[in-house]
C-alpha cells in the first residue's frame, strides 16, 4: 500500500461487479507504535475497524497517540468505532482508561469522542478468487452509508461523505440488528439450502 498509495475496490451484486480505485492512501504498520501513535496524534479524525477480539491490541497505540496529541494541542479527537460489538464505546473507553492516569482521564473525558457506528456494509473474508490477482483488492456490497452516534462527538461534527450522524443512536443499532443482520442471516440460510457459497450469488 505504501508503494502504490492506492488499492482496488470491487462492488459486487447479483448484476455483476464494478471496479474502482481508491487513491491517495498511506499506511502505517500497527506493530510500529511510534508511527501509529504519530498518525493518531496528528489526525483530524480516526476510526477502528479491527474486529472485537483485536481491539485490545490497538489500545496501547491509541493511548500513546493521545498522550502525544494532548502535549501538542487542545483539539478534540473523535474516534469512530466500526466494530460489530454492543456497547463498543463503553468497552473501548474502559480499555483505554485502564492505561491512563487520573489527570489523563480528565483530558480524555473533555477531548475524546468515542463515536459508535452502525456497520451496514458487508465485507466478506477475501478469498483468492475475490482478490482476482491483486492481494489488496477488497470486494464489498454497494451500500455505503455509515450511521454514527451524533451525541458522542466532541467539538464540531465533521462533514464526511456518506457519514450519517444521528440521535438517538440506539434506534439505528436495534434496526440494524433486527432487520439488516436478520436479512443477511436469512439469505445465508436459504442460499446454503440451494447450494450457494456467497450471499451475493
What do the PLM-derived regions correspond to, one by one?
Residues 1-23, 27-201:
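Substrate/ligand-engaging "lid" and interaction regions
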Amino acid at each position: 500500500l505504501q508503494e502504490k498509495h492506492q488499492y482496488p475496490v470491487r462492488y459486487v451484486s447479483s448484476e455483476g461487479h464494478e471496479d474502482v480505485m481508491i487513491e491517495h492512501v498511506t499506511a502505517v504498520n500497527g506493530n510500529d507504535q511510534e508511527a501509529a501513535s504519530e498518525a493518531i496524534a496528528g489526525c483530524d479524525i480516526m476510526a477502528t475497524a479491527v474486529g472485537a477480539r483485536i481491539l485490545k491490541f490497538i489500545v496501547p497505540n491509541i493511548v500513546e497517540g493521545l498522550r502525544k496529541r494532548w502535549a501538542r494541542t487542545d483539539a478534540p479527537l473523535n474516534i469512530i468505532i466500526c466494530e460489530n460489538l454492543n456497547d463498543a464505546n463503553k468497552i473501548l473507553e474502559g480499555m483505554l482508561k485502564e492505561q491512563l492516569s487520573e489527570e489523563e482521564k480528565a483530558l480524555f473525558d473533555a477531548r475524546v469522542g468515542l463515536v459508535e457506528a452502525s456497520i451496514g456494509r458487508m465485507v466478506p473474508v477475501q478469498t483468492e478468487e475475490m482478490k482476482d490477482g491483486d492481494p489488496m483488492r477488497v470486494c464489498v456490497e454497494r451500500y455505503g452509508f455509515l450511521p454514527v452516534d451524533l451525541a458522542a462527538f466532541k467539538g464540531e461534527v465533521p462533514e464526511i461523505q456518506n457519514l450519517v450522524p444521528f440521535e438517538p443512536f440506539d434506534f439505528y443499532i436495534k434496526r440494524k440488528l433486527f432487520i439488516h443482520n436478520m436479512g443477511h442471516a436469512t439469505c445465508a440460510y436459504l442460499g446454503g439450502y440451494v447450494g450457494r457459497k456467497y450471499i451475493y450469488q
